[in-house]
Amino acid sequence: MDAAAIISLLNSTSDRVDQFHVEVYRLSLYGAGIRGMEEETSLFNLFNSLNTSTGDLQLSVSFTVHVLKKFGFTGLAELTRYASPDFNMASSYPKADLLLTVTSFLYDLHPVRERSNALTFISSVYLNGYNYRSVTMPQFVKVMFDKGVIMIGDVSALDSLIKQYRPSFFNEYMERSKLTNTNSTFVSDDATQDNTAPAPTIPDDRATGTVAAEKGQPSAQVNQPPTTGGGNCTVSGSTQTSTNSFNSTNTVTAAGKEEKVSDDVTKGIKFLLMTATDPELKGVLERLKPLDGRDEVIEQFKNGVDLYIGKYGKHPVVVGQSAHTKGQQGSLPAEKVTNKIMEIFKPKYIIAIGVCFGMDGKEVNLGDVIVSDRIADLYNIRVEPGCIKARITDADKAGDTLVSLFRNPRNDIVSVIGKSRRFNMVKPSFDKENAKEVKVHCGPMVSTPALVDDAEFKEKLSKARPDALAGEMEGAGIFLAAKDHKVEAIVIKAVGDLADGKKIEYKDWKPFACQAAAEYVLHHLDDDRTIHM
């Protein structure tokens, strides 16, 4: 095993994980018999504790990859090469499997109302009104286990919820639990029984039966986006509905070797879907289905990039990501990764999907989808007193075929709620800034090297390109790669903030924007009229 390479990959992964994935990983270690990690917030340090306990680097990597992938964490193909293809959490570490399974079950309940109802039910019936809003989801599942609500091979306490929300869940878990093998490489629970941390004290305050926003949702001062629920968005009249989070069980991962994808599959791929950040990739992968004749989406690490091959609507596609870290955002990494993917596949069309910032405050609202008919490259600018000027004055046109497909009729602005051409994504507020309906606009975007969060600087961008509806960071590079390979490209992104100094306040709009853009592209690629493109 290349320990140095693994350490480097884990350091990089640790920088990218959010607090939820750290909480889940910590819960899995608790299930594996590792104690005393309650305050640790670094994935890398948690992994070190795991590796110290197992004394087996490959086992520790296998365990880690399993946990992160189960909850939709992406960009792990290279690390997965060091994992064992035979690793089975359920048979080796049944307690950890139980805790992760129940967390996944509750986490996947959408919308928020369903999840809140389920947690209120568990709290009221089994936990004497324990206030589940006072802890995170993984912490609540730990309380459930410590109080005997769930046990290895026995989740019957959740039977009514399972039948209501996911009928197959009970049978799936019971089948796995039959295979449990308590001869784990980890220290067994019996061996550490005397050192087991006591169950958290249940506070006196009671969970009410009221359905409310969960802990961690935006404050009342900022209008909240609707919870998209890991892709639980439907297109009216569409034959494809995305209801489940992207899950490692849907993916073929090359463990130590690359799976050979047939030439027929490679030649049949006409679309490259490019994303930048993890949330953008997640929005696309949640809607990616296995290719016809396959049970799983294909995940590969080739030419130095992570690739995902599957079906998006009616079309086989390859999905790429250019920014695994914040430092990789921007035009140059996007161009580099796009070129690498184009060396492997020969798609006719490139679609960049993700999040942008709104430029035109009169017309563009948070959550709206922007279809770029042109990309104005503001990477090459001249800075003058009080203003900036684009040195490349001609904006790059998006592909005619793609613009024709994705732009909407009737002034390029149409509501996307309700009728046959509208997808079911509704905003919660009725004020002007966050208009209730998601709208689709078609017009120019600017592509900048900066992550813009300053109203004054945005005003300068607006003066440089007064026709621009939105701005983003990767489009210019993707358009350059498309030119090099003589293919069409387009940027379709949804507004996640207004670049006016309030990015932190808007942060909960970013997941919604990722879902909106991904869903809009899916809506059109699922149209029978696109089959012969």
Curated annotation (Swiss-Prot):
GO-annotated molecular function: adenosylhomocysteine nucleosidase activity; methylthioadenosine nucleosidase activity
Highest taxon of source: Eukaryota
Pfam entry (one): PNP_UDP_1
EC id: 3.5.99.-
Region named Disordered: 184-248
A GO cellular component entry from the record: cytosol
Listed GO biological process terms: L-methionine salvage from S-adenosylmethionine; nucleoside metabolic process
Keywords carried by this UniProt record: Hydrolase
InterPro entries: Nucleoside_phosphorylase_d (IPR000845), Nucleoside_phosphorylase_sf (IPR035994)
Biased composition (Low complexity): 236-248
Region of interest called Purine nucleoside phosphorylase domain, as start-end residue ranges on this chain: 263-533
Function, as annotated: The C-terminal purine nucleoside phosphorylase (PNP) domain cleaves the N-glycosidic bond of ATP, and to a lesser extent dATP, to release adenine and a sugar triphosphate; has weak activity on ADP and AMP and no activity on dADP, dAMP, adenosine, deoxyadenosine or other (d)NTPs.
UniProt remark on domains: Has 2 domains, an N-terminal death domain and a C-terminal purine nucleoside phosphorylase (PNP) domain; the PNP domain has ATP nucleosidase activity. Expression of the C-terminal domain alone leads to cell death in E.coli.
Name of the protein in its database record: Death domain-containing ATP nucleosidase
Species the sequence originates in: Amphimedon queenslandica (Sponge)
